[in-house]
Structures are given as structure tokens and as C-alpha cells.
């Protein structure tokens, strides 16, 4: 049931929601992934130009500013930025934002429940693929969810220095992810395919989650490469011992979306305080302050 404070969706909006349940999510995603890899010369350059114009992509931030410099749409979509395009906050007590986009939700984790949108919440256990022990670590903690729109830079960075403890691939649905659907599809973020990364940091245990969506062709990390495809029907888990530890620095790239979606960060109770300016809909960029050490 929808929250009484929310407007009921219109007829066309209800059709849009219903379509999410019946469309061939996987086949659309596979097709989009195949198309995005093709190198069709001037045709590819023309498509990239149309996309950049439609979504107002700022090409002046990119290392390669000309459309002709991108051999495929994938290459364009995960384009690196100029080194000076994003400044990483140098305050040692601050954690920085991992992605460009807008705040979808942020705040306090009520016991083991996170807010997805007004009227919709989801559980930590569901989000973390049934890992009850991991979920307990974040009871009464803090969280931040960042939505990456098509125009945004789609590489994901580290909020702080960290050591990778565990990575979990979770198969799932491929619903489209955007603010409207977050309000109308229950448990969307805990149902979609995702990659969960668990880190040890001086700010306590931190989780950073890459959430997939329709036409998210792949998600990758700098230590493991492309995680999907191939897509598995089972949860996969990798643990990292001291011998195989992956050390990452604040602001360092940790992963990327090829056509992207959402990044979720989880923090333990009484470890950090989210920055005051963060609120639903606020635009954010890599390197800006996410939270401060308590």
C-alpha cells in the first residue's frame, strides 16, 4: 500500500510500473551490453554525440573530449576524467563521496531497516544476501544511497583508506532504478543484482554496494575485473586474507558500471556522522565530504 502522503500514480505511471514486472529484463540487458561493445566507427560516434546532447554530458571534464576518440559506447560510458576534475577532500577525519549523482536516501539505519523512498523500506539482511552476521554489524548505523543518472561519471571511488575483507556477488532482478521507481517498487534495491564489498577501515567496517539495473551491462572492480557477465544464479563470495589483502586509498577508483545505477554505503553505529548538507535529491560529486569521524 502506498504511503497516504504520497500522490497516487497516474494511469501512465501505473503502466510504467507494470512494464517493469513483465519486460524481459535480462534479454534487454544482454542486448544493451552487446550493442555497447560494438565498434561501428562514425555510427558509434554519432550515437555517442546524440546521447551526450540528450543527457547534457560535460565532455570538458573527460580526458578525451572528442566523440571520435571513443571506439565504443562502453568506452565512452566509463570515460576517465581529467585529474583536476574531481578534488578529493583532504581532511583525515572525513570520508568522501564515492560517486557522482544525487542522494537517493541517507540517514540512520533503524535497527536493521533502511529507507528506500517515502513509504518503502527494506532490510539489511535482504540487502546483504541473507548474511545475518554482517547485517548485525550495521544495526543502528548510517547509510547513504547515491543514484547515478545516465549523464553521470560512472566510475566508483573509495570514501577512505581501506582493506578489502570480502566481496559478494548477488544475482537478482534487473529493474530500472530511478527515484520514481524507488517509490513504487518495494524492496527494489534489495532485489536487484548487486556486488557487495566489505572493507576494514579506521572508521570501522564499511560496506560499499554496486547495484545493477536494466541495461547495466556489467559491474567491475579494480581487483577482480568484470564481475558480471557471466551472470550466475547463485550467490558467490570471495574472502581476502592478509596474504591476498587488497589495500585501497581514499579517492582511489574501486569499480565501475557499464551503464549504471546506484551505490550504497553502510557504516557501523557511532562511527561516523553524515555531512549536514546531504539530503534527498542533493547533487553530489566524487571527493566531496560524505561523513566525518565521530
Swiss-Prot record:
Residue numbers marked as site, Cleavage (non-hydrolytic): 260-261
Pfam families: PS_Dcarbxylase (PF02666)
EC number: 4.1.1.65
Positions where Pyruvic acid (Ser) occurs in the chain: 261
Record localization: Cell membrane
Active site: 100 (charge relay system), 157 (charge relay system), 261 (charge relay system), 261 (schiff-base intermediate with substrate)
Keyword terms of this UniProt record: Cell membrane, Decarboxylase, Lipid biosynthesis, Lipid metabolism, Lyase, Membrane, Phospholipid biosynthesis, Phospholipid metabolism, Pyruvate, Zymogen
Coarse class of the protein's main subcellular location: membrane
Top EC class of this enzyme: lyase
Annotated function: Catalyzes the formation of phosphatidylethanolamine (PtdEtn) from phosphatidylserine (PtdSer).
Assembly information from the UniProt record: Heterodimer of a large membrane-associated beta subunit and a small pyruvoyl-containing alpha subunit.
Record-given protein name: Phosphatidylserine decarboxylase proenzyme
Gene behind the chain: psd
